[in-house]
């Protein structure tokens, strides 16, 4: 096909996909009866066609893009100016849609209002709102009776799975993207006019290449495993807690010794959960900070409004120095902090132990504050030997007499994530960067700044979830996805299929 030009609608030439006739009728899903369009607005595309958009990753960020695109196409379906729909595809490494499956702890709740779902802030009338999900599943009144804005985490993941199921025809699951490379230079313009996305089917190893004018990289963060921790099956990142620990420690009544490293929400949740999951186990929470610190979630502008979509504009327009100062000042809203009610529960548990055993060394559950794990070894019994180093701060240690040794059957690292996975996937794109000394710099609309002398204006790459330094603390959070998804749709496809506002 001819992939060198675009239609007036911003879609590639070639086989046209007419806007489907809208027709609603009942459809049964794996969870419960629902209503869905019998003819998707976004039909499947064969691998050998030039795509208008390929999204690398199909987590919440890419799902929000799919929803925003669907909603806008629905609004323009009867417009005489829209005669074709974009050709898009999502490539996802996981076997199905999943959101933090390793941290779906029993009883855990969301930390943001359900109103900040994948659609409501952008369009409360969208069929993809959390409230519509509840209505479809006949739970709207039941949820209302809970009197809360914070759904159970397991329910919110089910909501997102329900949304994702509407786009199943567009997603290639169990597909790992290997790299994104520039196309051959167009002989007429002398510029790159599309990109090649190379991926591998995990089950068979089959490698497939697809071509796209626009590529969104939204692969989320990689577990951060500090260098001092060796590769060991008994050392688990918090992201795999629920999916890995039960098989590793399969006797819930055994007197295990389990350590957790970290001082944020995940560390506190796991420490608290272990005491119920393994009632006879000894648990230890090890952290560099001197205490668990409460998150600041006041509704006033200085705190919660930091995560409002419009704050992204304000943050982006600041100088680099101002941005860095802002991030450091407001770190307590998102990093190494714990919701106050969980801190209170943990403190109450510690206090009961103090009543029973004045000697803290006799406690079943302990918190080792102002400590770091300096070394990890394993013995013949396969237990981990942890060397703890007490410290005044993160970098200044006390004398050796304050060091301790600890044995553990498992160590869970709640050490956060690194968000640089895009760099390896886009390694071949680096020579095309507009300002190589600035690294992977993106514009306000998340478009990677590429050299206009080398890359056609109608081709581009967008980065998601790795732009905190330029777009603020909300960049990796759910709070702004509804609006951001529409911004990406607008940036790629233009005003004719914008956010509809």
From Swiss-Prot:
Cofactor names: FAD
Inducers of expression: Expression is under the control of the iron acquisition regulator hapX.
Keywords from the UniProt entry: FAD, Flavoprotein, Monooxygenase, NADP, Oxidoreductase
Upper taxonomic lineage: Eukaryota, Fungi, Dikarya, Ascomycota, Pezizomycotina
Residues noted as binding substrate in the record, renumbered to the chain: 116, 304-307, 334, 479
Record has Cell membrane as a keyword: no
Positions contributing to NADP(+) binding: 263-266, 334-336
Region (Disordered): 1-40
GO biological-process terms attached to the record: biosynthetic process; intracellular iron ion homeostasis
Assigned EC number: 1.14.13.196
Entry protein name: L-ornithine N(5)-monooxygenase
Note on cofactor: Binds 1 FAD per subunit.
């Amino acid at each position: 096909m001819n992939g060198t030009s675009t239609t007036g609608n911003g879609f590639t030439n070639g086989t046209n996909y007419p806007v489907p006739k809208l027709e609603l009728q009942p459809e049964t899903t794996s969870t419960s009866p629902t209503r869905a369009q019998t003819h998707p607005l976004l039909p499947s595309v064969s691998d050998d066609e030039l795509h208008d958009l390929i999204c690398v990753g199909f987590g919440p960020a890419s799902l929000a893009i799919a929803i925003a695109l669907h909603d806008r196409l629905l609004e323009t379906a009867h417009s005489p100016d829209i005669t074709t729909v974009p050709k898009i595809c999502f490539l996802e490494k996981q076997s199905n849609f999943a959101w933090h499956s390793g941290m779906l702890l029993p009883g855990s709740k969301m930390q943001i209002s359900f109103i900040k779902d994948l659609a409501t802030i952008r369009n409360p009338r969208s069929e993809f709102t959390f409230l519509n999900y509840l209505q479809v599943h006949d739970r709207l009144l039941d949820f209302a009776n809970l009197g809360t804005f914070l759904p159970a985490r397991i329910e919110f993941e089910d909501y997102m799975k329900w949304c994702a199921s509407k786009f199943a025809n567009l997603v290639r699951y169990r597909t790992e993207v290997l790299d994104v490379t520039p196309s051959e230079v167009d002989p007429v313009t002398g510029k790159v006019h599309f990109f090649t996305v190379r991926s591998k089917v995990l089950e068979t190893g089959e490698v497939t290449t697809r071509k796209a004018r626009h590529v969104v990289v939204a692969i989320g963060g990689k577990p951060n495993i500090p260098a001092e921790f060796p590769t060991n099956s008994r050392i688990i990142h918090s992201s795999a807690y629920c999916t890995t620990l039960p098989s590793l420690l399969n006797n819930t009544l055994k007197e295990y010794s389990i350590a957790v490293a970290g001082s944020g929400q995940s560390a506190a949740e796991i420490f608290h959960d272990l005491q119920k999951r393994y009632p006879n186990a000894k648990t230890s929470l090890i952290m560099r900070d001197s205490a668990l610190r409460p998150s600041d979630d006041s509704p006033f502008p200085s705190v919660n409004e930091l995560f409002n979509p419009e704050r992204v504009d304000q943050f982006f327009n600041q100088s680099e120095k101002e941005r860095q100062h802002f991030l450091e000042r407001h770190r307590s809203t998102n990093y190494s902090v714990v919701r106050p009610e969980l801190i209170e529960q943990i403190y109450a548990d510690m206090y009961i132990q103090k009543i029973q055993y004045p000697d803290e060394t006799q406690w079943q559950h302990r918190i080792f504050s102002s400590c770091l794990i300096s070394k990890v070894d394993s013995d013949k019994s396969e237990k981990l030997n942890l060397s703890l180093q007490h410290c005044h701060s993160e970098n200044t240690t006390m004398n050796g007499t304050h060091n301790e040794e600890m044995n553990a059957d498992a160590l869970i690292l709640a050490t956060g994530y690194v968000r640089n996975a895009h760099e390896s996937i886009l390694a071949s794109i680096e020579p095309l960067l507009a300002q190589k000394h600035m690294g992977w710099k993106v514009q306000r609309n998340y478009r990677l700044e590429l050299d206009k002398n080398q890359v056609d204006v109608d081709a581009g790459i967008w980065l998601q979830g790795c732009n905190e330094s330029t777009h603020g603390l909300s960049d990796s959070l759910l709070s702004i996805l509804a609006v951001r998804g529409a911004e990406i749709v607008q940036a790629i496809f233009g005003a004719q299929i914008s956010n509809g506002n």
